[in-house]
């Protein structure tokens, strides 16, 4: 009985080996490059994309290698709306950073939100733009979604907001800036 198992295993291995093609001199080898979608242990995917439009300080449109366009929301932050105080400033700050890298960024994401937007981290030349929006006083930490951040980002984001508040950076120069959630409640979309 053991002999049959061993013979079966050998036959299986032999069938796999027979299917392997070894290049020989003069054989033409074609290299096929396809975009690789990398997924980390915690379920986050990484993709290189181009930002095609900045909507506000926490939402952009992106286009991937295949030309597919999607709305992308910066995870863990809530920036002022465009018509809200500091809204235009927040969007312009994000746009200036993106101009410096010709709008080429990496997105690190795991899911979509209830509005169909991809939600994740925007990275330009290794710089976390979500974190930068907080550090420069152009966004709040969106505390409702801290659990969705990558490990380690929660503390960085919280400390960045504390520092921006303490040093009255950006919107924190205002003694009483209005949280975007409150502003949206007072100004519902039709």
Give, region by region, the residue ranges found by the protein language model.
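Small beta-barrel nucleic-acid-binding modules, primarily SNase/OB-fold domains
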Residues: 1-190
